[in-house]
Structures are given as structure tokens and as C-alpha cells.
Amino acid sequence: MLPRWMYSTNHKDIGTMYLIFGAWSGMLGLSMSMLIRMELGQPGTLIGNDQIYNVIVTAHAFIMIFFMVMPIMIGGFGNWLVPIMLGAPDMAFPRMNNMSFWLLPPSLFLLINSSLIESGAGTGWTVYPPLSSNLSHYGPSVDLAIFSLHLAGASSILGAINFITTIVNMRSIGMTMERMPLFVWSVLITAILLLLSLPVLAGAITMLLTDRNFNTSFFDPSGGGDPILYQHLFWFFGHPEVYILILPGFGMISQIICYNTGKKEPFGNLGMIYAMAAIGLLGFIVWAHHMFTVGMDVDTRAYFTSATMIIAVPTGIKIFSWLATLHGSHIKFNTSILWALGFVFLFTVGGLTGIMLANSSIDIVLHDTYYVVAHFHYVLSMGAVFGIMGAIIHWFPMFLGLNLNSMLTKVQFMITFIGVNLTFFPQHFLGLAGMPRRYSDYPDFFTKWNFISSLGSLISLMGVIMLIIIIWTSIIEKKMINFSSFTNSSIEWMLNFPPSEHSFNQNNIILK
């Protein structure tokens, strides 16, 4: 049994390991966010130390991004679905696929260790110098976090190479690029973004490592360096990264909406592909909107403001194409479409607050307040996570050959929906009132909305626990699929449930 999983080269086994690893990390990240919300639930201290609070915030961000969203979306669903949707026997480099996965547990181990050694890495996920320099953060904590990022980055780069090669070279006969399912397209564009942005992060954190340990001064003004250089390098990675987190979600939502409306492709399929490509391209030329407060001149700010707003155009194309796909069709209201509808609505809300923050003059006031926290949590906690939840419920019968209790999953959707909105909507008010991020305490003027926000986080926690219970009961009761009534909107629904160890034993020909 151990060799089957340890040395596996089967894309389904590796995808399953990614999903389990992501779920485990997600619980870790969720418990950290609960600590954060309990600390902020009332004025005064609970944890009692700002450094530890910031260590928790930093670890929460890294775990949710690198060990929950990316492994589940790209590693889990990408590995499971891309070869099947292409009609390919497996990934292009199966053993490299195995290595991509096994780089992640040591990486997580290093990150957790960084919190346990000395006073931890309380730098925020951006790891800006001079706070992350050896003066403000002496000891090996930040170095361990840097090594952790190196490993996670290497894992993602290898995975990206694997996906690009697979998608370009291993499609079925008759499947042109244009005929590929949108989820495959989203993974391809995500992989290209990973391949182009992660080396820049690796360079930036390596320079930080040498600044801390080998007496260089890339980011130290006293030696002729500049901390703003680090910010440029970091955000040149950091902005494409947020699109890496959401693009596979776009693909999954497209598949879910098509399936539940009984269509084989969404409205404006080619437009959807071009929109994703445009989002990927534009994601690289807007990075400095994270840095409006560092003293860039007015022309630079004008450019980054307008470029950022242009990203709203392809995003709007996607939103309206989803609405057009839904419009007038006979919608099958199972739980996965509820997650998809929630995604479309809440992602739009998150996008609108993003348009607000794109204005450099407004951003100077709102920068580093809870308005920004509310914005990116609407996009991630209700974009990426809703995509993941919808995908789990949508493809669960295909992965395991078991049914989920449809009524309970609908209740779980409602609980989570109420929870996340109650958590993050009040944070817009806090941000507009001027409450800054990354502080463990606040004036009692902010008590009301913080209390409501923390209440919402408890409801979200109940929703996640309920999801675990639903999946657990489905597995122990072995609710087998006796009769397949799935819509053949995509190839994966034409296989067995679950698929055999080798999905296809011959080359396929796709006829449209």
C-alpha cells in the first residue's frame, strides 16, 4: 500500500494526495484564521503579543495560498481532470509529477518550524525588508520561511512545466486548442503565469537571504541598496499569483455552469478563452498598484491606475458570459450550481471593491486598512474557496463513485454563505473608518463590526466542519452510484465512477 502512494506515477493517485494535503493544510490555515478572529473579537489582548499575532497572520496567508488553494486547484483538480479531459493516458512527466507533490510536505514542515523557532517570522506574507532584515528579525525564522517558499516554488514550477507539456502535446486526435474544455485552458494559462512569475520571487527572496546572512546590501540603504526594489520584485510575482489562485476557479465554475445548464460549452467559448489569456497577460503589468504609497511619481501612478482598471474588462466578459450561459436555460439546481452562482455574485462584489482600490488617490487613504483585507478575501475566500467547494461537490461522485447527501450539502452551502459574508462585509466599514491591518488590538470605536466579523467566522467554521462530516458519512456509508444520470457535458462523465486506474487504453478521437 505504501509504495503505491509514495512512489505513485498515476495522475489520479497524485491528485488525490494533493487534495488530502490541501484539505489538511486548509484546516491548519482555518484554525489560524480563527485565532486571528478571536483575538480581534473584542478590544484588549487575547494572545498577548503583537509579534506572535503577526506570526499567525503570516503563516495563515502562506498556508492558505501555497498549501491549500494551489495544491487543491492546480495539484488536485488539475492532476485529476486535465489528463482525462484531454483524453490523455496520464501527465507528460509522471515521476516529476510525484516529485512536485513530495516537495510540498517538507515545505510546510519548514514553514511551521519557522514559527516555532525563536520568535517566529512576523513579517506579513509580503516579507518586506527592513522588517524582515536580520536587524528586526534576527534568528533563523525568516530564513526557514524563505526556504519553505523556495521548495513550494520549485514544486509549482515543476508542476507548471508538466501541465504545459501535457496540454500542448497530449491532446486526443481531433481535439484542437479551441475545443479544449475551459478548465484545461485555465490550468494552461495558470501554468504559464507560474512559470514566468515564480523565478522572480525566488530571486527576490534569495537576495533577502543573502542580505540577512552574507552581508550583501540589495535592500539595505546603508550599503547602497533599496528596499523598494524588493517590493517591485515581490509584487511582480505577487500580482500574477492572485490570478494564479483565481484562474483555475474560473475554469471550474465554467464547467459547473455548463454541466448544470445542460450545455457542452458556455456562451462565447472563444471569448472566454481570450478573456482568461488577457487577464493572465495584464496581470503582469499592474504590480505597482500594491505600492501606491511608496512615493512613485504621478505619471507612474496614473499608468498603474488605468492598467489595473483595464483588467476589469476581460473579467466582466467572463461574468456576463456566465450569466448569458445561465440565461434562459433549464438550470438543474443541485448544490454545485449554488456554489457557482455564489461565486459569480461575490466575485463581482470583490471585483468592484478592487476597482475602488485601483484609484491611486483613494488607495493612499485605504492602503493597509481592512478595506483591502475585505477586498481580497471577497475575491479569495468567496472566489477561490467557493470554486473549490463547488468543484468538490461537483466531481466527488466521479472521483470516488459515491453520492453526497444533496440536502445536507445545500444546508452547508447556506451556512458557509452566511458565515463568509458576515465575516468580511463588515470589514469594508472598518477599513473606511480607518482601522489598519496587522494590529492585534484596536480602539473600542471599532468593537461592533469586529465582533460581528468574528461571529461570522464561527459560522464559517461550522460550515467547514459540516462539509467534513458530509464527506465522511458518504464514505463510511458507501453511498454507491447505482445508475449514472450524469450529463455528458465533458469527457470525464463518460468514464466509470470512479475511473479505472488507467482511464483510456487507446488513443481517443474527439468528434464534435
UniProtKB/Swiss-Prot annotation:
Residue positions binding Fe(II)-heme a: 60, 377
Entry keyword set: Calcium, Copper, Electron transport, Heme, Iron, Magnesium, Membrane, Metal-binding, Mitochondrion, Mitochondrion inner membrane, Respiratory chain, Translocase, Transmembrane, Transmembrane helix, Transport
Domain of life, per lineage: Eukaryota
Positions of Cu cation binding: 239, 289-290
Bilayer topology term: Multi-pass membrane protein
UniProt GO cellular component terms: mitochondrial inner membrane; respiratory chain complex IV
EC number of the protein: 7.1.1.9
Summary of subunit composition and partner proteins: Component of the cytochrome c oxidase (complex IV, CIV), a multisubunit enzyme composed of a catalytic core of 3 subunits and several supernumerary subunits. The complex exists as a monomer or a dimer and forms supercomplexes (SCs) in the inner mitochondrial membrane with ubiquinol-cytochrome c oxidoreductase (cytochrome b-c1 complex, complex III, CIII).
Name recorded for this polypeptide: Cytochrome c oxidase subunit 1
Gene encoding the protein: COI
